């Protein structure tokens, strides 16, 4: 596939999400979905756009969902956390609304690489707090091992 094909697929993914979110019945889910930003990553990820919920100000806090889930997992606590933190909730690589053509490999190492590139793109290099649910918890530990100087608390 060409770079243009990847970009077109990425745009279609974002367009699909924007129309699909309107069918969310849970008001907290819709509140969270309205804060999704599509963050374009580097060539390692075919320059695709990835969905990341971002809101609030303050110390950054990264929320990592569990297996077979999405950023919507945190809809019940997002509004509350957003009052005091810069909340960042990505869909983990290969889950939720993340583009499936970003890589042909989906494993814990790729998920960590993806998160590191996302944090670099967002210029988050220190004082990061992480909350991980289920698989997101083990991902948080692996991420802290890889970038210990960036992590404040898990």
Question: Over which residues does each language-model region extend?
Answer:
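Short, hydrophobic alpha-helix immediately C-terminal to the catalytic nucleophile
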Residues: 75, 116, 141-145
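Conserved HGGG/HGGXW glycine-rich cap/lid loop of the alpha/beta-hydrolase fold
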Residues: 48-97
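Conserved hydrolase catalytic core segment
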Residues: 84, 122-154
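Basic, gly/Ser/Thr/Pro-rich low-complexity segments located predominantly at protein N termini
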Residues: 61-63, 71, 99-101, 137, ...
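Active-site loop/oxyanion-hole signature of alpha/beta-hydrolase fold enzymes
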Residues: 30, 35-46, 50-53, 89-131
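Alpha/beta-hydrolase fold catalytic core
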Residues: 1-61, 82-85, 124-126
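Glycine-rich, phosphate-binding/catalytic loops in enzymes
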Residues: 78-81, 104-106, 146-149
């Amino acid at each position: 596939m060409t770079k243009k094909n990847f970009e077109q697929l990425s745009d279609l993914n974002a367009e699909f999400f924007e129309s699909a979110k309107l069918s969310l019945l849970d008001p907290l889910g819709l509140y969270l979905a309205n804060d999704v930003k599509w963050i374009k990553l580097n060539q390692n990820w075919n320059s695709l756009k990835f969905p990341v919920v971002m809101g609030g100000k303050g110390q950054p806090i990264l929320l990592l969902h569990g297996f077979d889930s999405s950023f919507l997992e945190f809809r019940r606590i997002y509004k509350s956390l957003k009052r005091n933190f810069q909340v960042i909730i990505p869909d983990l690589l290969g889950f939720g609304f993340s583009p499936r053509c970003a890589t042909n490999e989906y494993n814990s190492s790729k998920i960590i690489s993806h998160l590191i590139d996302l944090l670099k793109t967002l210029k988050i290099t220190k004082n990061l707090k992480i909350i991980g649910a289920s698989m997101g918890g083990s991902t948080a530990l692996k991420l802290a091992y890889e970038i210990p100087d960036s992590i404040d608390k898990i």
